[in-house]
Amino acid sequence: MQKLQISVYIYLFMLIVAGPVDLNENSEQKENVEKEGLCNACLWRENTTSSRLEAIKIQILSKLRLETAPNISKDAIRQLLPKAPPLLELIDQFDVQRDASSDGSLEDDDYHARTETVITMPTESDLLTQVEGKPKCCFFKFSSKIQYNKLVKAQLWIYLRPVKTPATVFVQILRLIKPMKDGTRYTGIRSLKLDMNPGTGIWQSIDVKTVLQNWLKQPESNLGIEIKALDENGHDLAVTFPEPGEDGLTPFLEVKVTDTPKRSRRDFGLDCDEHSTESRCCRYPLTVDFEAFGWDWIIAPKRYKANYCSGECEFVFLQKYPHTHLVHQANPRGSAGPCCTPTKMSPINMLYFNGEGQIIYGKIPAMVVDRCGCS
């Protein structure tokens, strides 16, 4: 009994020496730990951002089948860039899309059909599309996007050289056909009469949707077209084979197709901003600036919102596959935890110069993170 009393006295004495327990100190320690966790999260997101930007550069070159970024100067771009209205409108559309999505609230819609514009430049013709051994303008090859989607519109754009005095110009578009018995090689497509004022040349568009539809149904009938634009004196004003100083004035096709949707609507994941303290798997904003890369060869867009995924994945939270949780419950040690990854991505349209100085308008798949989840 006496030993027990001595032990109690010693215990009380030590409590008095140690002083009262400071609950505020524990709170401060907890708060410091939380702040340290938030700082680590910010640092993690910074590293993720840098890695994502480098990955995007590699992906773009790979998906465009380019080993390195084309070395094209800004001066060369100014000389090569076509001055045609539809291309200028296309560039303007990139600006409109950028402004419309600047708040980050818009998401690519995979449910509804979308109309896309494809700019097709003429290619070199083969012997079959030549007349008397001379190549004729113009022969067009069509990508699978045009072949396998609904055709909405097809316009042939031609540039007419300026006239010195007011003139009436007769424009004729002819379709090349296989030689007939009488030697005929052409059949008419369109003809129109234009009144031109002196001073400047003009771009003129001609509807060729019916012709293009026939070509798509019977590819072997596509031997090319002949373009003529004669004034009263018989001078051909159409630029078919550009002369020096006529860069960017080559005829081309502007084709609009409706892209069929392939996926249905799904629920959205979490969206966060760069100042968010959310620790769970979330989509964060990330803007890719091609000018900052020094990639002048990309005409449009100059920048776009790519986004990235970051955060922790607890089981059952935003999991892509419901059975993932059941597998973990059955064997918690034998299954790796879920990771925060993109569960939905969308493409971007891009207007760019390839390594040969040609202008290409195409779609690069899976370049924008639309939704993040755990899988």
UniProtKB/Swiss-Prot annotation:
Q: Where is this site: Cleavage?
A: 98-99
**What tissue expression does the UniProt record report for this protein?**
Specifically expressed in developing and adult skeletal muscle. Highest levels found in the hindlimb semimembranosus and biceps-femoris muscles; low levels in other hindlimb muscles.
Signal sequence range: 1-18
User: Pfam families of this UniProt entry?
Assistant: TGF_beta (PF00019), TGFb_propeptide (PF00688)
Q: Where are the transmembrane segments?
A: none
Gene3D superfamilies referenced in this protein's UniProt entry, alphabetically: 2.60.120.970, Cystine-knot cytokines
MF terms from GO for this chain are: cytokine activity; growth factor activity; heparin binding; identical protein binding; protein homodimerization activity; protein serine/threonine kinase activator activity
Q: Propeptide residues, per UniProt? A: 19-266
Record keywords, A-Z: Cleavage on pair of basic residues, Cytokine, Disease variant, Disulfide bond, Glycoprotein, Growth factor, Heparin-binding, Secreted, Signal
Q: List the disulfide bonds.
A: 272-282, 281-340, 309-372, 313-374
Per the annotation, which location comes first and is thus the protein's main one?
A: secreted
* Annotated consequence of substituting residue 313 to Y: In mh; Piedmontese breed
Q: How is it modified post-translationally?
A: Synthesized as large precursor molecule that undergoes proteolytic cleavage to generate an N-terminal propeptide and a disulfide linked C-terminal dimer, which is the biologically active molecule. The circulating form consists of a latent complex of the C-terminal dimer and other proteins, including its propeptide, which maintain the C-terminal dimer in a latent, inactive state. Ligand activation requires additional cleavage of the prodomain by a tolloid-like metalloproteinase.
| Compartment annotation | Secreted
Q: How does it assemble?
A: Homodimer; disulfide-linked. Interacts with WFIKKN2, leading to inhibit its activity. Interacts with FSTL3.
What does the protein in this record do?
Acts specifically as a negative regulator of skeletal muscle growth.
Similarity comment: family membership: Belongs to the TGF-beta family.
**Known disease link:** Defects in MSTN are the cause of the double-muscle phenotype or muscular hypertrophy (mh), an autosomal recessive disease frequently found in the Belgian blue and Piedmontese cattle breeds. This disease is characterized by an increased number of muscle fibers (hyperplasia), resulting in an increase in muscle mass of 20-25%.
What PANTHER family does its record include? Answer: GROWTH_DIFFERENTIATION FACTOR 8, TGF-BETA FAMILY
Name the chain's protein: Growth/differentiation factor 8
Q: Which species expresses this protein natively?
A: Bos taurus (Bovine)
Identify the gene encoding this protein.
Answer: MSTN
